[in-house]
C-alpha cells in the first residue's frame, strides 16, 4: 500500500466534474497577470485558466501562481496554449494583443489586434459557448465590437472594461484634492476609453452634495480651481505610467477584478463599462461605448440613462462617429 492509501480512507468516489466558477484569462502579459493575481486575491473562482501563445512564459506564470497555493483559496490553476483548458468558463477575460507603445494612440493598435482576435474568439466560443466575454485589450471599445461580431454572442454577454478604470482614476484624483477616500467621491466618466472620454460634471458629488451646485464653473474653462485638469490627468495618466515603467498593469488588473466580482457574485452593481449603445444618445451605428451598466451573472442587463448636457451628448456622438469610421474599414 502507498503512503496515500495508508493515510486516506476513501468514502466517496468523486467524479471529475467541471468547475462551477471558472475564470479564464487570455494573455499572460503584465495586464493579464495583474488581472489573474487580483482575481485570486479576491477568491472569485474555483478554477483559473491561463492561455497564451508563448508557452515557456505561460508555464512559468502558472507554476509561480501554483507555488503560492497555500496562500490562496483557488484550488485549481491550469494553463495551456490549447483552448481546451478554458472549457466551461463562466467568464473569459481577454487581455491578449499588441501592446500600446509610448506615444501611440489606442486607436492605432486596432488592426494588429483584430487579427489576434480572429484566432482567440472562435476558440473561446468553441469551449465555453455560454460564457461572458470581458474585453480588456486596447482599443477596448472597438475590440469589444470585434469580439461581439466574431463570437456571435448576444450583446449583453460581451463587455468591455471601458471607463471603469477612467472613472476610478477620476475618483482617486478627486479624493486627493478633497482629502476623502475615492469610495466617497462620486463621479462618472463615460464614452470612449481614452483620449475622448467624457466627464459628467453634473453628477460629481460627495455625500449627495453636487460640486457643480457649490461651484457652477466646475469643469469649465472659466473655473479658477481648474477642475478640468482632473479629467486631463485621467486622460494622460496611462501615457505617463507607460512613459515611466513601460506599461500599465496594477490599476487595470484591480479594475478588471472589480468587474469580475460583480459578474461572479451577481452583485448587480452599476459600472461605467463598454456596451452596445446604438439607439442611445442619438447614436445610429453598431458601436460600443461606456455608459453606466447594471452588471451581474448574465452580463449587462440594464443601462442607467444619464441626464447629459447637449455638449456631453455631442462629444459621445463624435466618439461614436470616430469609432464607426475605423470599424467600417476593419478586415474580419
UniProtKB/Swiss-Prot annotation:
EC class of the enzyme, as a word: oxidoreductase
Active site: 193
Residue numbers binding NAD(+): 29-57, 99, 138
Compartment annotation: Cytoplasm
Pathway: Fermentation; pyruvate fermentation to lactate; (S)-lactate from pyruvate: step 1/1
InterPro entries: L-lactate/malate_DH, L-lactate_DH, L-lactate_DH_AS, Lactate/malate_DH_C, Lactate/malate_DH_N, Lactate_DH/Glyco_Ohase_4_C, NAD(P)-bd_dom_sf
A cellular component annotation (GO) from this entry: cytoplasm
UniProt function note: Interconverts simultaneously and stereospecifically pyruvate and lactate with concomitant interconversion of NADH and NAD(+).
Subunit structure: Homotetramer.
PANTHER family named among the record's database cross-references: L-2-HYDROXYCARBOXYLATE DEHYDROGENASE (NAD(P)(+)) (PTHR43128), L-LACTATE DEHYDROGENASE A CHAIN (PTHR43128:SF10)
Family: Belongs to the LDH/MDH superfamily. LDH family.
The name this protein goes by in its record: L-lactate dehydrogenase A chain
Species per Swiss-Prot/TrEMBL record: Caiman crocodilus apaporiensis
